[in-house]
Structures are given as structure tokens and as C-alpha cells.
Amino acid sequence: MLTIAALGVLPWTTAAARECESTLGRGWPPAVGNYGTAVTTLLDGGTKPALSLLTLPTRGVESAVSLVPGKEGADWTLRHSRADERVYSWVSQTDRGSVQFRTQQTPETVEIPIPAALAKRLVSNWTNTLTQLAPNGRTAPVSEGEVLSFQVDGVRYSGARPSCGAGELLLKQAALLIEASEGKEKKRDKRWTQIESSLDELQQTLAGTAG
């Protein structure tokens, strides 16, 4: 981890840059916006998340994990949504094909409470991380495969799946959120503790002190 710890903060060596280049940029990748927006609208279900991670796979159904603010001082809501059938559909015709979005469906959604303090820390840490991985002026790159799209406080960051450094830690935290939503209630406190530990590691990584 030492060679990738300086992600976005300390001057990179050439070797470190090669080892862990950011795959993310601002907004949607070219030609993905309409698809991504359709899936987001379906999976958000009228909520307004402060943080979300949308997965647009090359095959299979689309999914999202998100945090929705609660009322003053109350727990937030952790949502994990999955399309019932793949939204993106290629329809072959005699002389050409066309894309259709299957949005007339009801996604599978699980909602559980998450402590407000932890949710706010996730929003803050993800904002700091994503603004370093995808600074202003860096647009989301062209993608022909799976697209991951983060949205935090109204700003979208998209690209290929991060496989190292701070980006990989965000995915670890998202996976723990999903585990919390799918697991037993008695195991949630353990998941929250694991997320807190991962956030500590994320802060160390960004500060260049992870070892």
C-alpha cells in the first residue's frame, strides 16, 4: 500500500502513478448519460441520496447502494436497490437495432437505518476522496465495459472499477454497506465498526501514511 498511499496528495513517482492511476472522471462517460440517468431514476425511487454508487454491468441487472439523509438528528436510510430485469435492452430490427430502457418495472429494494454520524462521515470522506481522484476539469473517460458511477452531494464521478488505492477502499466500504443491508440486524454494529476502520484507512491513504 505504501507506493499508492500518496494518491492525489503527495507528488507521485512514475512507478506509483503506473501502479494506481485513477479510473474516474466527472459526470457520465460519453454515450452513457441517458442509460445511467434512466437506471438512477428507477433505483432511487423518488429519494434524494446524499451519497450513491451505481453499478452498470456489461451483463446482468443494474444495482445501487445509497444513503438518504434523515430528519434533524435522526438515523439516515441505507438503501440497496437492484433492477428486477436488466434496464438496458438492445432490440434487433431488420436493417438496424435500437436501445430501449426497461424502466416500467419494480426494483428489489432493501432499506435499513444507519447512524447519522457514520453516514455523514461517509459523505465527507467520499467527497474528499473523489475530488482528488477526479478533480475539476477531468471528465469521465470513454468506457466500453462495466461503469461505476458515484454521486456525492449532487456531483457525479464515473469510470471503470477502481482496483487499487483510495478508489478500492470506497468499493470496500460500499460492499460493507451492502452486507449490512442484506445481513441480520444483530450484525449491523459489526459492519458499522468495519466501515469506521476502513474510513480511518482511507484517511491514512490520502495522507500518505498507510503502511
Locate the predicted segments by residue.
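Bacterial N-terminal signal peptides
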Residues: 2-11
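Function-determining sites in protein domains
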Residues: 17-211
